Every structure is written in structure tokens, then in C-alpha cells.
Amino acid sequence: MENHLPNIFYFPNCVTTFPYRYTQKELDDMKPDERERFKYATFPIIKHRWSHAYVVKDNHVFKLNVETSKRLRRATPPTLSVPVSMNTMLREYITQDGTKISFECYSYLTCKKATSLHDLDDNAIRGLVEGGNRLQLFTNSVGSVKDTVGIFGNPNPFMKVPLKSLHPSMQCKIFESWIHHVPVVLTGDTGVGKTSQVPKLLLWFNYLFGGFVNLSTITFDVQEKPIVLSLPRVALVKLHSETLLTSLGFNEIHKSPVSLKFGNMQEQFVNTRFRRYGIVFSTHKITLNTLFNYSTVILDEVHEHDQTGDIIIAVCRKYIRKLDSLFLMTATLEDDRQRIEEFFTESVFVHIPGGTLFSISEAYVKNSNDSLNKFMYIEEEKRNLVNAIKTYTPPKQSSGIVFVSTVSQCDVYKQYLSERLPYKFYIIHGKIQNINDLLSDIYDNEGVSIIISTPYLESSVTVQNATHVYDTGRVYIPSPYGGREVFISKSMRDQRKGRVGRVKPGMYIYFYDVSELRPIKRIDFEFLHNYVLYSKVFDLQLPEDLFVKPTNMTRLRDVIEYIRSFNISDGVWTRLLSSYYIHILEYAKVYARGGQSAAALDSFERTGNLTDDALDAIKSLNMRAKIISHRKASTHTYALMCRLLFGVYAGKTFIAYHKRPLTGYITMITEHSFIPEY
């Protein structure tokens, strides 16, 4: 029974399971194995009710201080003996010598001297029922949603959740995986509640049973830690934490079991009274630096292969015994299953069945041009988009999402479509600051709204009234001092399609040949220095310990040698990585020196405000590029062909843009910005 979730501890989804208070009469009527279930209440009661409990004497009855509102002095506990009678109305036992003791006090004293759940008899179970009722621990298939008020100190009831992820059978499956302390790979289509419900379920399990070595040994020495849901972007941290808070009946984060962790957090997001058993929503960067502060680590959007996320996975495997549980959540295993099975040989795969709540139909619009003929392909694609939106139009008060690959394409497509269609057009991507205001306008629009977006909308924001997706099937993959546009992967297609079908039937219209879809190995497009630096911090062997290995091992070795040339010790690197963003590797030289220059550069990385001190610090790094040639790119812009003169990528040519036709040299400020050397 230790690895199985008793049904009285199901999370109350308020559809099939509700909070329930069990009476002593119901306990008497139960079969022995049904009564046994209540023994597991020992663990949450020890944590949340008995952690500061002691024995008092109230009107000649031994009780616990937590059972009475009276301020009574600590009493010497009685010697326990088997009760000879009981009063179920008063919830009291009477022993051979006439001592009266409450059911819960008897259970407390029994657990204090017991070492195993097997030591608890029916007399002890009665007190566990009383303590569990006070904590609202138990559930049943009957009850009221109103009874969820106060479970976590929440002022409002829990939300009703009919999703598959909180179905009792799925709760049992997830619990068994969690309690076995092995890596869990959780899959499920978009819309089954992976991100919105599974972390909430794991919070519930941690609240009940977290901090104990196993569920058979009784101990009052609880090593309780919070759990963490680690996400690749700040927008996701805010979105999913707000969703969970609301679903647990909270109006604000203060005094809730939820905490947020991301860079430059405003005071409104800080929970000053966070619970030890709670859940932290964190960006990958901060999770990596605080990884062992958590009992359960949940990594979401694993299929995206965010660089820091992949590093976390590598570190978790190296130190898996330091974690109680690891959950990797992904919409699809299309591209990753074989590697995960190789990387985590003891992993458990759990799939949440079912798709979105509503059906999603598909339509394919063929482009007659070869995608290699980019200009002709794009021109026909835009015409096809216009015709498709006319043919497959969202209903009034609904919206459609057009996926393009870049921010600049958002502007181009919006202008093209708005000149040919009578609908309201919006642009949403990661650089837009007022997304909530835009969503309010979209929801208030009585007509049809069309949103042009980058892959940002695949997961970062849920558009509640979206019914149609128009997918160009492309994504821009940045690379050091460049990048290129490629067709999306199967997992990205699934994510985009899953943006609809949540609140009403949806439609997915795609404008690409599915035979073009390929897995995207992002590590081959990335700066590799973070893999090298964190391998120093966590003693990883490269490339053996990496979750995804780069194709070009020579480049990895070049990065290792380049970092070695900085002459910065591993201890200093550890300090720098936990203190600074270090978006540009060379900035570490300034941070290692410290002083005013380091403070100014740090402020620039955090705020974008380039002061004279920060500029001087950057200039001291000699990050130069030579201008080879220039050409006019538009009315007010010139394209500068440049050759990089520093770092691992020295010799690489790239294009920069400026309002003037420059010659000579430029100094790189960031990967994408520079100042001319006049």
C-alpha cells in the first residue's frame, strides 16, 4: 500500500472528488483494510498539526494544545495503556486507571513512540481521523466545492477541473511515479492539464507526504522542501502561477503556497509568507542556481530544448539521488524518446490520454512554389493566407492566430493582411510589453480578431477565444552572430495546433508540406559556453554528461580552450554565474575584476540602460569587427557586411544594419548591437 495512493487522499478536483469529514460511526462500519488507509494521515498531521503540539490537561482530560482554544500549561503526558472504554461523542478514551485522554492525544503519544505505521492500531486510527478532519485532508466522491475553502488557507473555493490529469486513475499513476523517486517523463496532448494541473497535484502530494524518507517509517524529523516548476520564460512563470493561484482559491500570492522566482522581480510578485511545502514557479536560470533547494523538480516544455533547461536535465541526472523526484513534461516524445531512454535508464513514462476538450479539424493549403525560391514562396503564402482567412473565418467575438517566424514578419504580414481583410489585427510576441491590454481588446472585440505572432504564442500565452490557427510552419533559429529560418518540428506543430480546441471546437490550417518537418537540434545553433561553464560548477564531463550533444565536437573543444584563456578560476566562475546574467561571455572578464565597471555592466544587462561606465567597460574588452562592405538595404538603412575579430567565432562574417554607410571597424556591445568606431 506504501506506493499506492489511498482514495481518501485524492486531490479534490471538485468533479469526482470532494473534501470530506469522516465520522467515528463511518470508521466503525468500515472493513479493516478501509480503516488502514487512515494510517497515512500520520504524515501530514505530523507536519501541519503536531509540529508544535504538546499535551495539556483540560477538565481532567488529557488533550493536545491544538485541540482547544484555551491557553493551558504543558502537562506531563500519561503512561499509555490500552483503553477499556470510549466515548465517541466526546471523542475520549478511558484507560484501566480511569485516565481520560482524547482520541487525537492518544494517537499523538502513540506515534511519538512508534517507528512504523504497522505499530498503529484501531485506537490510534481514531485520533488520526480527528486530526485529519481538522486539516481537511480527506476526500470522497460526495461533497461540496465549498468545503475546499481553507485547505491551503485559501479564502475562495477550488475551481472545478474535469481534465484527465486530475481523474482519480491518473492521480494514482502520477503518485506511484512520484513516490518511487525515479525520473518521470510525463506526456499528454495540449489541453489535458499537464502544466496547469500536474504541478498542483504534486504540490498536494508534497503537502501530504513530502519530507519523509518513506511511507512506512514514522518520524517527527521532517526534511521538508518546496517543489519547483521550472519554465524557460518569465511570461510562462507569471501565466502558470496565476492560473494555479486562481484554481486554488487565492486572490493574491501573499500567504499562499506559491512563490515566484525570476530576474528583476517587482514587489507585487514576492510572497513574504511562503509555505515550506509549497510550489515555486521559476525560470530555468534561477532554478539551476538553486536546484537542490527543492524536493521535486518539474521541468516543463522539455521538447523546446531551451539551453538552460537541457543543462538542468544533465545536472539532475548527475545528482539524481539529491532529489526526491524529477518530472520532465513534454507535449510530445516525437523527437526525444530514444535519447531520454538512453539518458535516464530507470525512467518511468506516464501518458495522460485524451486531447483537447473540443475537436480540432485540419485544412492544408498547398504552396505551388518550392520553398527554396523564398520570394515567390512567401508571396504566394501571403495570398493563400488571405484566401484561407476568408474561407475559414473565426466566428464573431473569436480570434485566429497566424504563426510566422520573426518579429519583423509580424509587421509585414499585418500590413499585408489588414489591407485586404476587414478584421482587427493584433501583433503579439515576446517583445510586446502590454500583452494583457491587447488580450483585453481582443476579448472585447465584437467582431473577428486576427493575431499575428511568432512561436511565442505556442506556449507563453493562452488566448481564451482562439478558434483558428493559420500556421506558416516556419521558425527562426538564432545562431552566434546570425541565424536562419527553418521549418518547424513535429512537436512545434503539435503545440501550435493545440492553441485551439480548449473552449470550443477549433481549426488548424497549415500552409507547408508536412514532409518538410524535421527535429531541430538547437545545440548546433547555440553559443556553447554555458554548457562548459556549468560543467565546471557541477563537475559534469563533456560531452558525455550532456543531455543533447553538439554535432561539431571541435567547436565545443574550441570553446573550452577559449574559456581557459580567461584565467578565471572555477570558484570565481561559480560566483559569477550565480550573480550575473553574462549574456556575452566576454563580459565575465569585467565581472571578475569587480568594482564600478562590473556594477555598471550588470545594471546594463538587467535594465538595458547603457551608461558611460558600462560602455567603457565593454570597450575595454576589444570586441571588434571589421566592415568589409556595405549596401543600401532600404530608404534609411544600410547593410554592413562584417568580419568578427575576436572569440571562438573570429573570422565569421555577418550582416549588421546602420543608418549610415560605415567603413572601418565597429565595437560589438551585444551579439546584435554595436557602436561605430569613427
Swiss-Prot record:
The keyword Transcription applies. The gene is OPG084. Keywords: ATP-binding, Helicase, Hydrolase, Nucleotide-binding, Transcription, Virion. Residues 175-351 form the Helicase ATP-binding domain. A motif (DEXH box) lies at residues 300-303. It comes from the Viruses. Induction: Expressed both early and late in the viral replicative cycle. ATP binds at residues 188-195. It comes from Rabbit fibroma virus (strain Kasza) (RFV). This is RNA helicase NPH-II. It is found in: Virion. Gene3D superfamilies: P-loop containing nucleotide triphosphate hydrolases. Its EC number is 3.6.4.13. GO terms for cellular component: virion component. The keyword Hydrolase applies. Pfam families: DEAD, Helicase_C, NPH-II. It catalyses: ATP + H2O = ADP + phosphate + H(+). Belongs to the DEAD box helicase family. DEAH subfamily. GO terms for molecular function: ATP binding; ATP hydrolysis activity; RNA binding; RNA helicase activity. Monomer. Residues 371-546 form the Helicase C-terminal domain. NTP-dependent helicase that catalyzes unidirectional unwinding of 3'tailed duplex RNAs and plays an important role during transcription of early mRNAs, presumably by preventing R-loop formation behind the elongating RNA polymerase. Might also play a role in the export of newly synthesized mRNA chains out of the core into the cytoplasm. Required for replication and propagation of viral particles.
